[in-house]
Structures are given as structure tokens and as C-alpha cells.
Amino acid sequence: GCGTGRYCSVFKAYGWPVVHGYEGTPDITSLGVYNDIMTLDLTKKRWVGIEYDLVMSLEVGEHIPKEYEHTFIENVCEFASKDLILSWAVPGQGGKGHVNEKENDDVIDHVILKGFRFQKKLSKDLRSRAGLKWFKNTIMVFRRG
């Protein structure tokens, strides 16, 4: 979920030509800082009719009940034609609304099954630059193919 769209605004400011945000919270568009946000429930099989060069999902998976995690992963992977940046809270991280914290290796294994390769060096680089402490343990970068 993109929340109010802050990351979307940053990507757009840096010149990305097409930036869409998807959020599961109903009526999020009324709270958003970015105009191109759509409500989408990623616990249900979805196809938005477009693939993106990059899909970024940060700290969303841990809010998805375990019985829907495969659908969530399938959705974000299907939307990504090239690259996927994913973070998922690890066990013991804690946080409001966390119902499904997972070890990084479990997430990596799921995404690899969807046709992606884990980018260890790039993941490590992004983790080292992260400003939020939980991202230092959870950012994972994948490339299709």
C-alpha cells in the first residue's frame, strides 16, 4: 500500500514518467498527498491491466493475514515487469497491525518461485542507506528473469 503517496511524489519529482500508487485503505485518496492513488485490495487476485518497470511494496506484507500472503506476493510480482523492491517486517520487529511477520529467507523463497532473482548486493546497499531502522533489516531487491 502506498499510504498517502509520499513515495509516489518523490518518484514523480525525480522525473519518473508514470507513477501510480495502490492502497488498501478505503477513501485514501481524500487523505493523499499524491493525486494518482487508487484503492486496491491485494489480498484478492487482481490485474490492473498494466505492468510496471518497478514495483515497490514497503512494509505491507506483515499486515496481510497469512492465508492471503501468496495472493499478495503473486499480485506484486505480476505487476512488476522488471524490478521489485519489497520489505516485510521480520519476526519480533513489532508494529501496529502486524499479523504476519516473516523471515527474509521465507519472502525471498516465495518471490524466487515467481520468476525473480534476489539481488543480494543491491539489497545490502539499499539497507545500508536506509534512514528508517527497520529497513536496515527488511529491504529486498529482486530482478525478473
Where are the regions that the model predicts?
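Conserved SAM-binding loop
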Residues: G1-G92, D105-I108, R143-R144
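Residues that flank catalytic or metal-binding motifs in active/ligand-binding sites
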Residues: G15, E103, F135-T138
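Short aromatic-enriched loop/helix-cap "lid" or pocket-rim segments at secondary-structure transitions
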Residues: L31-Y34, E69, G95-V99, A130-W134
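A short acidic, often aromatic-flanked loop/helix-cap motif at beta-alpha or helix-coil junctions
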Residues: K45-W47, D125-R129
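C-terminal alpha-helical "lid/dimerization" subdomain adjacent to the S-adenosyl-L-methionine
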Residues: A89-G97, Q119
